[in-house]
Amino acid sequence: MKLLRLKITDPDGFRSLSCDFEHHFRTELSLQDELAQANDFAPFVCAGPNGSGKSNLLEALAAIFFQLEVLRVRRSFLPEALQDEAPDVSPVAFELDYLIRVPAEYRSPDSPPWAKVGVWKKAGESVRIQWENQADFSTDVYQAFKGGHADILLPQYVLGYSSGENEILSLPFFKMRFVQFDEYLNALTQQLSYPGHPETRLAYLDSGFSQAILLCNLLFQDEATLQAFREDVGIEALREFRIILRHRIPLDTVQLEAFDLADEDQKRERRNRIQAEARTRGLTESEISQSVDDWVRREIIKGNPALSETDEPGSTRYRLNLLQLLDGDEKSSLVVSALKRCATLSYIDDAGDALVLDYWVNEETRQAFRENFDGSALVLFQAFQVLLTLNLYAVSETLKTDLYTSTSHYVSETVPTLASDQRIMRFKFVRFTKQGVAEPMMLKELSDGEHQLLHSLGLCLLFRETNSLFLLDEPETHFNPDWRANFISRLRQCLPGNGEFAQEMLITTHTPFLISDSKPEKVLVFAKDEATGAVSVEPPGFNTFGASINKITMSKVFGKHETIGGHAEALLDEMRTRFEKGDENKDALISEIDRKLGDSIEKVLLIKAILDSDQPGTGEALD
C-alpha cells in the first residue's frame, strides 16, 4: 500500500486537523522512485513538538478505515448500532487517495501491479470508494464499492499500536474488537459455522496481545527471521507455556432467552403446546403457571448445543459454552481441537471448568503447530485473537451499544477487567531462554523496553506477508539510545520487502535517531500555529538521512537550539553573566566551569570566549 493524499473536508475538522487540511504523502517523482525499488521498505516518520498534530494524522487514517471496514462487513454481520447507512462518525467528510497491490488473479499480463483507489465521504452520506484505473485490469465493468472488489481495494489489515494510552487512536479499533466478539456470539446464537479467524481487518494490538505475538513468532519463525529479536533482547529459545481455556460462563434468564430463535407466533404456539402437555399429565393450572417459564427455557436449551443447565438454584443456573463453535473431535480443524493436538499434556480442571493445555517446546512441538495451523504464524495468531476476544463476554449489551456510538476518549475505562480465573483464555508460564541468564525466564520478567521492542518487531514479523497499513504511535518510548538508533534497521529486517506484498507504515516519534535513519521525503515535520491552531506538515528542509542527532534536534524538526539540559543551561548562563561583568578572575572562572559542567559545545564556546577576551582587539562580551 502507498498513501498518496489525505484531505479533511469535515466542517468541524478532525481533532487538531482543521477543515481543508490536506497532505500529499508523495510527489510524483518520489512515487516513481519507490515503485522502481519495490523491495526497499521505509516508514513515514512523523515528528514535531507535543501537541503539533502528528498523532492526529494516524487517528484520522484509523477513523477513515473504520468507516470503510463497517461498509465492508455490512455484507456479512454488523451490530445493529452500526447499521446506519451514513453513521455520524468523525470525520464526517474527507478524501483519501492511495495505491494498493492487486492480487495476481485480477491482473492480466499487461495490467499494472497497483490499483489506484479514491475514497471520499460527504457529510450526511455514506463513504464511497472508487477503483480509478479499473479499466487496466481483468475485472467486470467499472464500478464503485461492490462485490469482492471491496476486499482487494482495502488493505488486508490496518494495525494500530501505541506505547502509551492513545485512546483516540485505539477507539475505532476497540469498536471493531467488539464487532468481532458480537460476530462470534451471533454465530453461536444462530448455530452458524465460524471461520476461526477474525472477519474484521482492523486490529489494535496492545499489551494484551504481547504473549500471543511472542509465542507465534518463536514457534514459527526461522533463525534468520528471528535475528531482530536475538540481536537486541537476546531471546533464544521458547521452553514452555500453558494455555487455559474456560468452557462455560453463567447466564441469567434474560441472557438465556436471547438465544431463543423463535418468532412471536412460534413462541406463543410453543407455550400453548407445553401447557397442553402439562394438562395431559394431570398438573393443575397453578402448577403449570409456576413451571411453564422453566419448561420454555429447557426447550431453548435443547435447541442449542452451547447451552446447558446446572443443578444450582437461582436464576444463574444456566450455562453457555463459549468455545462450542471452536471445539470438535480429535480430527477436527477447529481451533481448540488443533491446540489440543499440539499440546504435550492436556487435562480438564473440574474445579474451574477449564481445559488446561501444557506445551514443553521442542522441534516436534513446532512441527505440530506448523501442521495444524497451515505453517503460518499469522494463522495461529488469529486463532489466539479469536480466543482472547471472548474475554469480552462480561460487557453488557447496553455498554456495547454505548461503545459503538461513543466518541469518548475514555471508553476503554468503562470495560470491566476480568480476574484471571474468569477469563475464557489466558496464557501462563511462558518461559524462554535468554542470553546471559542461567535459568529460563518469563515474559513478565523483561523490562518495559524489552517488552516494547519484542511487541513492535513481533507485530511486523507476523504481518510481513500482507498488504497492510501500520499505525505506530511512539513505539520506542522505553528504548535505550542504542535501540532507538537501530529501530529503523530492525523494522527493515522484519519487513524486507517482497514483490507481492507492500506495507505502509507511519510512526510518530520524538526520537531524532529515527529521523537520522530516514530519507527526507519520508520525514513529516508537524507544526501548529499558536494563533490559529492550524496544523501544517512540511518536509524537513535538509537531508535527514545520516544527519547527526544535534543537527536534527536543533533544526525545525524539534526546534531545540541547545544541546544541554535546561538546568545546566541556566548555570552556564549565570557564569556567562559573571564573565561579562568583568569582575571575575578568568582562570578561576574557567576552572569552575570545567569542574561543574560536562563537555558540550556550549561549554567550549564560553571558555573560548573567555580565553579570546585576552587577545588584542576582542571584547569581553559575547554576542
Description of each model-found segment:
Residues 1-80, 394, 398-566:
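Switch/communication elements of ASCE P-loop NTPase nucleotide-binding domains
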Residues 2-15, 26-28, 209-451, 458-469, ...:
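Extended helical coiled-coil dimerization/tether regions that scaffold
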Residues 33-38, 189-203:
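Aromatic- and Gly/Pro-rich amphipathic surface segment
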Residues 58-126:
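Conserved P-loop NTP-binding catalytic core
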Residues 107-164, 169-188:
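Glycine-rich phosphate-binding loops of NTPases
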Residues 150, 159, 165-166, 493, ...:
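RecA-like P-loop NTPase motor core
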Residues 156-157, 163-168, 195-242, 248-250, ...:
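P-loop NTPase catalytic cores that bind/hydrolyze ATP
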Residues 168-194, 563-580:
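Short linear, low-complexity motifs centered on an aromatic residue
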